[in-house]
Regions:
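Short loop/turn segments that connect beta-strands within beta-propeller blades
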Residues: 91-95, 129-134, 170-175, 209-213, ...
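A short helix->beta-strand "capping" segment at the edge of beta-propeller domains
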Residues: 24-62
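Conserved beta-propeller blade signature
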Residues: 74-77, 117-120, 156-159, 196-199, ...
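Surface loop/turn motifs at the tips and blade-to-blade linkers of beta-strand repeat domains
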Residues: 54-61, 99-104, 138-143, 178-184, ...
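Short loop/turn segments immediately following the C-termini of beta-strands
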Residues: 80-81, 123, 162, 202-203, ...
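Repeated scaffold domains used in trafficking and secretory/extracellular systems
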Residues: 61-67, 104-113, 143-151, 184-192, ...
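Blade-level signature of beta-propeller repeat domains, shared across WD40, Kelch, NHL, RCC1
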Residues: 264-302
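Beta-strand-rich domains and repeat architectures in extracellular enzymes and scaffolds
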Residues: 55-86, 106-107
């Protein structure tokens, strides 16, 4: 009997010691561990970053022509419904989406991040979108504007109009509009900080270098599968194809270098936010890949 009592006391002492030395796993701890397991199992490493995908933002339709207001973190995009109707949308940092109500048909957006101005391209001209959600007509009244981009200093705007996709140059605070012969037609206009203009024509990507009059085909990009060009906050120029292959573009040499892949198919648009996180638009969703400069799983043990 005494022996059994001694064994029971020893068992209780050992159990108490183990319990004190091993912290209790709470539900929150288990959730964090599960989240870390998923993050580290799906981590992607290229372009000097480690990328992990957040929970997708579900939408109904196909996002297009995505752009980001770096100051507020708002993501602007064109939503194409299953009935092929277009509307302009804003995805707020809170995760809520909002339809931008504008006269006529909203077709695309661009952000002048230097001056914190958001421009809306519609079938009845170009509007400015204000922080309070209100809009005002800016220029090109009566023009069916499909695409729009703004120079780095905000003084020059380029627009592509329907149905010819004719490109116009707008200056003098929206008061002067001229045709722009170097680009007879173009989709997805984008301009970098050195005023090089990127665009697509007949499913091929081109760059028109600043102060030149003849566009050059960008070498190293696949034909017919590109989703667009985006200039990051750090002035790097990127392109992505429909299979989420990311490319770095050298405007001076009109060439592209393949960087890596996000393992996503059916890409229709992409963008980068102010922290170089990558946003990818696919049918019924916007995916966000967080960018880490250091490996967040360097001390991870399965």
């Amino acid at each position: 009997m005494r022996k059994k009592m001694r064994l029971l006391v020893l068992f209780i002492c050992l159990t108490t010691k183990y319990a004190l030395s091993s912290p209790v796993m709470t539900r929150q701890d288990l959730f964090k561990q599960a989240h870390r397991d998923v993050l580290c199992a799906n981590l992607i490493n290229f372009n000097d970053f480690y990328y992990s995908m957040e929970e997708p933002k579900n939408i109904t339709g196909i996002p297009a022509d995505m752009t980001v207001h770096w100051k507020t973190g708002k993501v602007f995009y064109t939503l194409i419904s299953d009935e092929m109707k277009m509307s302009l949308q804003v995805l707020h940092p809170s995760g809520e989406t909002e339809t931008i109500k504008v006269a006529g048909l909203g077709q695309s957006t661009t952000v002048d991040n230097l001056n914190d101005i958001v421009y809306l391209a519609t079938d009845n001209g170009i509007y400015k979108y204000k922080d309070d959600g209100s809009i005002e007509l800016y220029t090109a009244l009566g023009e069916d504007v499909m695409y729009i981009t703004v120079s780095n200093d905000g003084n020059t705007m380029y627009i592509a109009t329907w149905p010819q996709n004719r490109v116009h140059k707008i200056t003098n605070d929206g008061q002067k509009q001229d045709t722009f012969p170097p680009i007879p037609n173009g989709h997805g206009l984008t301009i970098d900080t050195r005023n090089n203009i990127f665009f697509s024509a007949t499913k091929t990507s081109y760059v028109l270098k600043a102060d030149q009059s003849v566009p050059i085909k960008i070498k190293g990009l696949p034909s017919e599968r590109m989703t667009g060009v985006f200039v990051s906050r750090s002035d790097e120029i990127f392109a992505m194809d429909e299979n989420s292959n990311l490319y770095s573009i050298d405007a001076e040499n009109a060439s592209a270098k393949h960087l890596g892949n996000f393992n996503v198919s059916g890409v229709n648009t992409f963008a980068l936010d102010s922290a170089d996180n990558v946003l990818i638009g696919v049918k019924n969703g916007i995916l966000k890949f967080l960018a880490y400069e250091k490996n967040p799983c360097s001390d991870y043990e399965k």
